[in-house]
């Protein structure tokens, strides 16, 4: 220390001047101030914090703050002499901040190099708000524009290049808007340059290129973010890129002048025309244009290569390291979470949704086909040289971001316990750079299911569901696709799939068992082709005549069986006898036949109904459904199966629909039952009883099998694993066949095509689902899993909700996406999201912590979905918009129908009791045009409308006439139509149908009602094939099937009138429907008038048949005709004929203009129909008449059930088979109606039926379906009539008393036809002939039934006069004014009792009613067959086995018919023996009677009388307008009717349950169905 001091002293010993000392001190101080970095950084930040905390309230404070900000950004600043202007400058630009004397901001101007200062609004706003941080960011952005090494000249060139790029991009954005007039959302998702925000101040130009559905919702408020041209779009919304220019090590030729020539695009996409790059307009710069991401995004190796190929500039160097792409996606998603900290996820993530807990394992290392795992990297910016590259780059980035969004939807910070009860496990694994799979356990079976999502581009996601061949269907591919595109969320989609599967499971728990049983039975009992039972078919059988041209099968075993007398078949040797049992079982027969048809349909899915695809495809679908079924199909003529299956296209379409549809087809089997009754021996009856019981136990499974088959058909388009979704969804929407015989097969085939159609059209799916939902109104429909579609749609109303569950899609009722979605299915499909009982949770799907409940419901979401879809934001959105609400979704107003029209329908359904028809018509906004209505409604609205409206309407209709109102009108109409309406149908078809109607004045009235049922079917006019296949029912069946339908002038009218729905209107079908409509319409026309809408027929205006007829006529003529027919039928037939009247004749005829003819001819019968009208009314107008409804379904419910599924297949409805009646399912109109016309009718009927709960709707629909699907078989009576006229079909006039041979031929032809015409006859003849209700129940059944009928008719003259006129079948009873609701059933009995009775013979109905008296048995059966009997297996069962029939709601629909004492009684007897559901025996009873000996008939009659008395009392209580006699059976019928309406399941449940419960509505039905299960 001392030495140091010495040195200092020696060094400074000399005295320095003071100035030098001061200078030295200053130097030291300056150095210290200039060293404020590193160690002083903390002090600097503290000073800045203090400065920010100071309030800027004076001029000096403001200038100090501005100088500080400039200094922080490396810029210089100075003040003007007066101190009110502050300049922040740099070499390339400067800012001018103008202040007043108090320090308040006046303006901020920015001046770039050599440019005049320009005011910047954003900077002004920020400084006025004292937002100095954002102001500082702007300064940084300005500095970065010129952040290039080099002199000012180079910087100027770079700025010019950036400026030219911005001008070009701005012009491109303007051109796109000019060419497309796109909305903000469309610009973002599809715009060539996205949504462009120009550069402002220091914020560079940004392009918004993608927003997910969740981006459109405000997390805090839950409200959707509005994107409109008038409002600024937040820069932070969605995914954005910034357009910049940055220095690079390489030289690039960049344009320094705009390259776009002119101001108009060269195409309709806004593509501009660029000038070529030249030295004059570009320069070489050490810089490049960049699209910069705010945060690096994960991009897979494949997309990086695509981008590099597009730009020609490498994005990454060769040494770059790639990581598992899914790992990068999870990191990216977790980084967006506001919650800090890392998540130890181990690639396992949990999602908590309403009612479900999911665990997702993201398999990041899953090998791709090339053996490598999916690799990717984080991309921060993309270089490019030309503005024309921007659209391509954005398209690729959108695609990648869409994939990332889906994968990222599984990534949540939610934590759940591993042992959480009910935790669902899912594995997400990549299959390619844009395709991945989600594997999970099958909801029903213990097997693995896989959903493959292929993100084709940012707006299209293709989904396929892969399952085992034996696995139950879950939902359609289209449904999944719509859900995904709606929400872009895997958890939401998985929940929707799960809920849909649960609905289906509830509806078809025993499908597998049924399939196995059927298979075993077939293997053991299948006789050789030459065996008498199998091959004995008269060459002239109607079946063979009806054989679809495209069908590779000749009128083989099944047709021969139809042709054979019952005794002959019974007498068949061992195997033949066993096989007889099988074939006699409506369910089994329909199932088997449906399988056949299904295959055929599959093959020709895209072809119109007339062109039935070769049966070759049938085996595939059968195989998918069940090997046994496939084999059986090979032996059986495709025609019969087509008819059976064609009757329930919707069912096929929906995953649940396929099995059920086939079961529903077995409705014809029921008629068979009736045949046995005519000439059957006790031994045979017993066998049939046993067999039915077996079938019933296996019903659900067999339905599943059917589902598989249906799926198989769909599978044609889906992977070999048989993706259930597409298979299920498509088939139902197939065209209805215009040619009767072709139609039968075609219907089935059409369904398959439907599937194809459904995939693109969620609306169709939803419609199908809606129809199915309405078809499966009651728990009793468990058996009729033909209502599989219903399952898809959450059973009945719920099916809709399931398809497009509100929970699934919050957009518009959430359910709307069927779906599609529909189902809608989108339809499973997004349908009954409103309050569908099957809905797992409220309409708001995202109630859970992880999902925004409003996400999917918001309009913007809709827009998003639409925009998200390549089609445009409207595509997806519109579909869901069509599902504007759960209600609309339920209505099936998804995409096919205009939202307004759909709403109108829905509103109408809600609004008017009697306006059922008008509702449908109104809903379709084409009330006057049956075809239009059918097409519109059936395709989109009718099914869903039927379901939804059915719900609403049930309430309204309940008020009106419970049984007669609404769907019952359609359904009942259909059923009675089967019996009496067959005649009417014929008559409708041709003027001579009037003669038929006249033949049986009292019964005729019922018949007319039945005819109206066909009319309803006619409603399906748009799908005349349905009519021929099912709707053509009595009159049309035989005729329409062949030349008759085509020859009959009314058919051409029908075709014209029903251009859309009618497909080729299936001249036979069309005319049949219309004929039927005409005949019934004559009488039912009045009732139509009374109804003046669906309601009209449904209105309990038994007494005012004339008024009903007139109103019905009006409706029919106005295009509400379909409904009108239903309505007229309901009113006219009140009890017995009500169904047939309103259903077939009135509406269709009216629609076709045949109404006047029919009206006139039926005019005298209007009054008798008046009673039946009530029956019809129940199904049409009143939920109350639900039983009636069911009844019609009962008679035709089995058909109806199967048909209901068909409604699920509105297009198939076109195919018209009983299923075609699908429309009828909903409205009781016709199969055709189901898709379009039927949809309209069904819609209306359904609407009315819906009040009956899904059950009632189903019943009505079903009956209607059956009726429409088998115009001739709209009811047994209808069959008789139809057989007379339809069977003969060719003869425009339906002679009331054709020769027995002619009648038999007609019946056979109708049955054998299995085609549009044949199907109807079959439906009518078999279903109708047997019970009218059974015939109504299922097209296929009807086909079989027809065969049986011919046999029965051969057995007795009843068949002759009644059989031909519907006498052999319940329809005949229906025809008899006496038999009311039980017409179909009663008719069958009556026919038996009075084979030669002709139409009047139907009065034997009392006896039939007695059989219906076996209602106790029916109830018990109903309980057994809850949901499925009618709609699916149950219905076929019922048709095939009296017991099943009686059990099933399908039988109950018969009960509706049988509610008219005679029909019900007859069938009740039969079905009573066969099953506990004997109460419903009206329809099944008739067949049972056929099967049973006279002794048993007597006993059953007595029992049924008792039951009838009770039932009548019950019905009276239920406010059924039908006569007490018919209602005496009707109670069971009523309940069964409900069941029928709701489906066979419903029938059982509903049978025991009062009509009111059935009338409760779709919701009720849905509830019932699960209960049944």
Curated annotation (Swiss-Prot):
Listed PANTHER family: MEDIATOR OF RNA POLYMERASE II TRANSCRIPTION SUBUNIT 1 (PTHR12881:SF14)
Q: How does it assemble?
A: Component of the Mediator complex.
Q: Where is the composition biased (Low complexity)?
A: 1025-1038, 1053-1085, 1092-1116, 1124-1143, 1155-1164, 1226-1277, 1461-1471
Q: Where is this region: Disordered?
A: 595-691, 774-883, 928-1564
Q: Where is the composition biased (Pro residues)?
A: 606-617
Q: Which GO terms describe its biological process?
A: positive regulation of transcription by RNA polymerase II
Please identify the protein, giving its name as recorded: Mediator of RNA polymerase II transcription subunit 1
Positions with biased composition (Polar residues): 651-668, 791-804, 835-864, 934-944, 1176-1193, 1278-1290, 1420-1435, 1443-1457
Q: What is the lineage of its organism?
A: Eukaryota, Metazoa, Chordata, Craniata, Vertebrata
Origin species, per record, is Xenopus tropicalis
Q: Where is the composition biased (Gly residues)?
A: 963-973
Q: Which gene encodes it?
A: med1
Superkingdom of the organism of origin:
Eukaryota
């Amino acid at each position: 220390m001392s030495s140091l001091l010495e040195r200092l002293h020696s060094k400074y010993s000399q005295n320095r001047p003071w100035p030098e000392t001061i200078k030295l001190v200053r130097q030291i101080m300056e150095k210290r101030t200039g060293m404020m970095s590193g160690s002083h950084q903390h002090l600097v930040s503290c000073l800045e914090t203090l400065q920010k905390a100071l309030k800027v309230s004076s001029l000096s404070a403001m200038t100090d703050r501005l100088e500080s900000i400039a200094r922080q950004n490396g810029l210089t600043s100075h003040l003007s002499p007066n101190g009110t202007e502050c300049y922040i400058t740099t070499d390339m630009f400067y800012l001018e901040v103008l202040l007043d004397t108090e320090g308040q901001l006046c303006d901020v101007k920015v001046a770039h190099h050599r440019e005049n200062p320009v005011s910047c609004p954003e900077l002004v706003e920020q400084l006025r708000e004292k937002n100095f941080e954002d102001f500082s960011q702007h300064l940084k952005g300005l500095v970065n524009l010129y952040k290039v090494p080099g002199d000012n000249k180079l910087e100027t060139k770079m700025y010019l290049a950036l400026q030219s790029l911005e001008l070009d991009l701005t012009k491109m954005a303007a051109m796109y808007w000019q060419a497309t007039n796109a909305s903000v959302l469309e610009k973002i998702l599809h715009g060539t340059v996205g949504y462009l925000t120009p550069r402002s101040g220091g914020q560079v130009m940004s392009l918004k290129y993608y927003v997910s559905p969740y981006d459109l919702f405000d997390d805090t408020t839950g409200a959707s973010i509005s994107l409109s041209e008038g409002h600024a779009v937040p820069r932070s919304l969605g995914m954005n890129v910034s357009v910049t220019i940055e220095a690079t090590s390489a030289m690039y030729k960049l344009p320094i002048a705009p390259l776009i020539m002119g101001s108009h695009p060269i195409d309709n996409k806004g593509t501009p025309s660029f000038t070529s790059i030249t030295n004059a307009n570009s320069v070489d710069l050490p810089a490049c244009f960049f699209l910069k991401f705010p945060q690096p995004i994960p991009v897979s190796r494949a997309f990086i290569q695509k981008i590099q190929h597009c730009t020609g500039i490498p994005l990454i160097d060769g040494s770059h390291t790639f990581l598992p792409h899914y790992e990068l996606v999870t990191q990216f998603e977790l980084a967006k979470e506001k919650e800090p900290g890392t998540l130890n996820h181990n690639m396992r993530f949990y999602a908590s949704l309403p009612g479900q807990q999911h665990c997702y394992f993201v398999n990041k290392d899953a090998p791709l086909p090339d053996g490598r795992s999916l690799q990717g990297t984080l991309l921060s910016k993309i270089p490019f040289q030309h503005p024309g590259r921007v659209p391509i780059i954005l398209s690729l980035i959108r695609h990648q971001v869409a994939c990332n969004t889906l994968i990222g939807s599984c990534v949540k910070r939610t934590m759940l316990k591993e042992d959480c009860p009910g935790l669902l496990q899912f594995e997400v694994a990549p299959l390619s750079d844009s395709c991945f799979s989600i594997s999970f356990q099958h909801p029903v079976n213990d097997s693995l299911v896989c959903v493959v999502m292929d993100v084709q581009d940012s707006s299209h996601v293709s989904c396929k569901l892969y399952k085992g061949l034996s696995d139950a269907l879950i939902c359609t591919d289209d449904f999944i696709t719509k859900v995904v595109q709606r929400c872009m969320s895997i958890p939401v989609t998985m929940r929707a799939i799960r809920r849909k599967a649960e609905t289906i499971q509830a509806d078809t728990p025993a499908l597998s068992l049924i399939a196995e049983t059927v298979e075993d039975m077939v293997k053991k009992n299948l006789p050789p082709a030459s065996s008498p039972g199998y091959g004995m078919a008269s060459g002239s059988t109607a079946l063979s005549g009806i054989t679809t041209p495209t069908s590779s099968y000749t009128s083989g075993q099944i047709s021969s069986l139809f042709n054979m007398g019952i005794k002959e078949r019974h007498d068949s040797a061992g195997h033949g006898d066993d096989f007889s049992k099988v074939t006699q079982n409506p369910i089994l027969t329909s199932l088997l036949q449906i399988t056949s048809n299904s295959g055929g349909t599959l093959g020709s899915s895209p072809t119109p109904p007339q062109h039935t695809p070769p049966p070759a495809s049938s085996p595939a679908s059968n195989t998918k459904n069940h090997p046994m079924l496939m084999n059986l199909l090979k032996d059986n003529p495709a025609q019969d199966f087509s008819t059976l299956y064609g009757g329930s296209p919707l069912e096929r379409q929906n995953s649940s629909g396929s099995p059920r549809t086939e079961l529903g087809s077995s409705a014809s089997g029921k008629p068979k039952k009736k045949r046995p009754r005519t000439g059957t021996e006790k031994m045979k009856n017993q066998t049939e009883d046993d067999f039915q019981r077996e079938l019933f136990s296996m019903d659900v499974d067999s339905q599943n099998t059917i589902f598989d088959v249906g799926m198989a058909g769909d599978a044609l388009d889906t992977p070999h694993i048989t993706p259930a979704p597409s298979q299920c969804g498509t088939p139902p929407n197939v065209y209805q066949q215009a040619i009767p015989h072709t139609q039968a097969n075609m219907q089935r085939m059409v369904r398959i095509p439907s599937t194809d159609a459904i995939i693109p059209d969620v609306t169709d799916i939803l419609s199908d689902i809606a129809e199915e939902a309405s078809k499966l109104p009651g728990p009793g429909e468990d058996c009729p899993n033909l209502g599989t579609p219903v399952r898809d749609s959450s059973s009945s109303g719920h099916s809709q909700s399931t398809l497009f569950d509100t929970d699934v899609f919050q957009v518009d009722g959430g359910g709307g996406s069927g779906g599609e979605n529909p189902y809608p299915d989108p339809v499973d499909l997004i349908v009954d999201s409103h309050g569908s009982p099957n809905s797992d949770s409220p309409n708001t799907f995202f109630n859970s912590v992880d999902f925004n409940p409003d996400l999917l419901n918001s309009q913007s979401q809709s827009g998003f979905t639409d925009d998200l879809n390549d089609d445009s934001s409207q595509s997806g959105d519109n579909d869901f918009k069509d599902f504007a609400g759960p209600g609309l979704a339920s209505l099936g107003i998804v995409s096919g129908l205009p939202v307004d029209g759909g709403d109108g329908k829905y509103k109408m359904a809600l609004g008017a009791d009697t306006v059922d028809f008008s509702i449908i018509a109104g809903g379709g906004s084409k009330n006057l045009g049956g075809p239009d209505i059918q097409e519109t409604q059936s395709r989109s609205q009718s099914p869903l409308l039927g379901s939804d409206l059915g719900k609403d309407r049930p309430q309204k209709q309940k008020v009106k006439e419970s049984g007669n109102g609404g769907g019952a009108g359609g359904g009942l109409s259909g059923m009675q139509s089967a019996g009496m309406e067959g005649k009417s149908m014929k008559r409708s078809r041709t003027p001579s149908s009037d003669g038929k109607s006249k033949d049986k004045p009292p019964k005729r009235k019922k018949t007319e009602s039945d005819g109206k049922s066909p009319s309803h079917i006619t409603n399906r006019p748009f799908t005349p094939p349905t009519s021929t296949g099912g709707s053509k029912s009595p009159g049309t069946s035989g005729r329409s099937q062949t030349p008759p339908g085509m020859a009959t002038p009314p058919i051409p009218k029908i075709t014209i009138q029903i251009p859309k729905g009618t497909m080729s209107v299936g001249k036979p079908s069309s005319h049949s429907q219309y004929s039927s409509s005409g005949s019934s319409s004559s009488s039912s026309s009045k009732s139509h008038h009374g109804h003046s809408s669906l309601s009209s027929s449904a209105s309990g205006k038994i007494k005012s048949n004339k008024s009903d007829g007139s109103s019905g006529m009006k409706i029919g003529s106005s295009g509400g005709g379909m409904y009108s027919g239903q309505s007229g039928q309901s009113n006219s037939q009140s009890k017995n004929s009500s169904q047939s009247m309103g259903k077939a004749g009135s509406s269709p005829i009216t629609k076709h203009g045949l109404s006047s003819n029919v009206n006139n001819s039926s005019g005298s019968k209007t009054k008798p129909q008046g009673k039946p009208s009530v029956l019809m009314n129940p199904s049409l107008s009143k939920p109350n008449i639900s039983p009636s409804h069911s009844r019609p379904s009962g008679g035709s419910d089995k058909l109806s059930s199967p048909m209901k599924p068909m409604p699920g297949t509105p297009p198939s409805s076109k195919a018209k088979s009983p299923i075609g009646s699908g429309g009828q399912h909903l409205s009781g109109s016709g199969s055709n109606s189901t898709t379009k016309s039927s949809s309209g009718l069904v819609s209306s009927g359904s609407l009315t039926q819906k009040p009956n709960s899904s059950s009632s709707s189903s019943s009505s629909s079903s009956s209607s379906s059956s009726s429409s699907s088998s115009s001739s078989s709209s009811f047994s009576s209808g069959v008789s009539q139809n057989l007379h006229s339809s069977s003969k079909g060719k003869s425009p006039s339906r002679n009331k008393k054709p020769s027995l041979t002619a009648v038999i031929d007609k019946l056979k032809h109708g049955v054998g036809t299995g085609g549009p015409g044949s199907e109807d006859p079959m439906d009518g003849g078999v279903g109708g002939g047997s019970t009218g209700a059974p015939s109504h129940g299922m097209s296929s059944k009807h086909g079989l039934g027809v065969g049986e009928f011919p046999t029965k008719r051969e057995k007795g003259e009843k068949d002759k006069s009644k059989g031909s006129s519907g006498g052999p079948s319940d329809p005949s009873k229906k025809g008899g004014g006496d038999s009311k609701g039980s017409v179909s059933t009663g008719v069958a009995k009556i026919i038996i009792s009075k084979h030669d009775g002709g139409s009047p013979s139907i009065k034997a109905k009392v006896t039939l009613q007695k059989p219906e008296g076996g209602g106790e048995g029916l109830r018990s059966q109903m309980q057994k067959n809850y949901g499925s009997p009618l709609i699916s297996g149950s219905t076929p069962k019922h048709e095939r086995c009296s017991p099943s029939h009686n059990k099933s709601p399908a039988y109950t629909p018969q009960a509706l018919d049988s509610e008219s004492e005679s029909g019900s009684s007859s069938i009740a007897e039969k079905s009573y023996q066969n099953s506990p559901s004997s109460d419903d025996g009206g329809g099944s009873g008739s067949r049972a009677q056929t099967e049973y000996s006279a002794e048993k008939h007597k006993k059953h009659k007595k029992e049924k009388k008792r039951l009838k008395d009770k039932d009548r009392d019950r019905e009276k209580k239920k406010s059924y307008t039908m006569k007490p006699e018919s209602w005496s059976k009707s109670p069971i019928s009523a309940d069964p009717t409900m069941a029928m309406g709701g489906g066979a399941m419903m029938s059982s449940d509903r049978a025991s349950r009062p009509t009111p419960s059935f009338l409760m509505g779709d919701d009720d039905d849905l509830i019932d169905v699960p209960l049944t299960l």
